Each structure stands twice: as structure tokens, then as C-alpha cells.
From Swiss-Prot:
Keyword field contains Lipoprotein: no
Domain of life: Bacteria
Single GO term (MF): proton-transporting ATP synthase activity, rotational mechanism
Compartments (UniProt record): Cell inner membrane
Species in which this protein is naturally found: Oleidesulfovibrio alaskensis (strain ATCC BAA-1058 / DSM 17464 / G20)
Membrane topology: Peripheral membrane protein
Protein name: ATP synthase subunit delta
Subunit structure: F-type ATPases have 2 components, F(1) - the catalytic core - and F(0) - the membrane proton channel. F(1) has five subunits: alpha(3), beta(3), gamma(1), delta(1), epsilon(1). F(0) has three main subunits: a(1), b(2) and c(10-14). The alpha and beta chains form an alternating ring which encloses part of the gamma chain. F(1) is attached to F(0) by a central stalk formed by the gamma and epsilon chains, while a peripheral stalk is formed by the delta and b chains.
InterPro entries referenced in this protein's UniProt entry, alphabetically: ATP_synth_OSCP/delta_N_sf, ATPase_OSCP/d_CS, ATPase_OSCP/dsu
Gene3D superfamilies: N-terminal domain of the delta subunit of the F1F0-ATP synthase
GO CC annotation: plasma membrane; proton-transporting ATP synthase complex
Taxonomic lineage of the native organism: Bacteria, Pseudomonadati, Thermodesulfobacteriota, Desulfovibrionia, Desulfovibrionales
Family: Belongs to the ATPase delta chain family.
Amino acid sequence: MTGNIAARRYARALFAIGQKQGLAELDAFGSELSAVAKAVEESPALARLFRNPLFSIEEKRAVLAKLLQAAGAGQTVSNFCNLLADKGRLADLPDINAFYSLLLDAEKGIIRGELVTAIKLAKAKRDAVKEQLEKQAGQKIELNFSVDKDILGGVVLKVGDRVLDASLRAQLGILKDNIKRGE
């Protein structure tokens, strides 16, 4: 996700509407917006069309109407996307969706992160790590687990904009720097 300020504002606006209607609507808006944004992300031609000023708003709205129908978007998300078309912001849908997802996670008390290991962890070990992190954070954590043999050993935990690098590769790098400095 980029630092697109307009995308953040639009996401907050849709989120505020959803908050007034309840958590179920927040989830529904998130699902609908995600389906539309995914279609834009997966189709470079669609993204180019939405960015291209040579196409009129009416032409973009016609394509958008078909997209919204295929995605099963409700009235509120459809109106929201039509507003984006009027303002020339349809190309920002993926960024708007990403920020909306962050707002929704914060509302639900969910933290998303990634745990990178050198080898694939067994399910029991993954569950134990997740449970321990949830206990320390005091919140529910959604972890994606990935394998990167280049870290040699240990783990790298990425949560939000924070990274905890407890990998063997990082430790060896620190040792190398200390040797170079003569410590």
C-alpha cells in the first residue's frame, strides 16, 4: 500500500458510514470493496482504463457498473465507487481497499503480521508461536507464515511497520560489523 492520502480519506469516509450501520455492515463493505479492488488489481487493462483521462466518466461508469454487478456490490459500495468515478479516483481502489482493511482490523482488535523462518514450522509450533504472540500483544493476531532459507536460522517477525529480526543472518551481520570495527 502506498502513502496515498486521498485513498486514506476515502477509506475513512466509507468506514465511517459503515460504523454508523454496525459491524456487520463494516464487514460487508469490506468484502464488497475487496472484490472490486481485486478485479482492478488483477486486470491491468481495467486499471489503465480507470487512469486514462481520454475515457469519459460515463464510459468509466458503464464499465464500473458491470464490475460492481459481477462483484455483487451493495448500494452503498456502488454509490461509493460511482463517487470515485466522478472524482477520477477509481485507479486508487486497491489502495483504498488496503487502508479500509487496516481500519477494519483495528476496529476488530486484530493485528496482522508475518513470521519468516528458515524451515517450515509444524502446525503445533505455528499455533504455539501465535498463541504466545497474542498473549504478549493482548490482541488477536493473524499471522502469515513463510519460509526463507536465506535467513539461515531463527525468525523474522513483521507486524505493521515494525520488524523484529532474530535471524542467524542478522546476528552474523552484527558479528561481522563488530569484527570490522575491532570490538
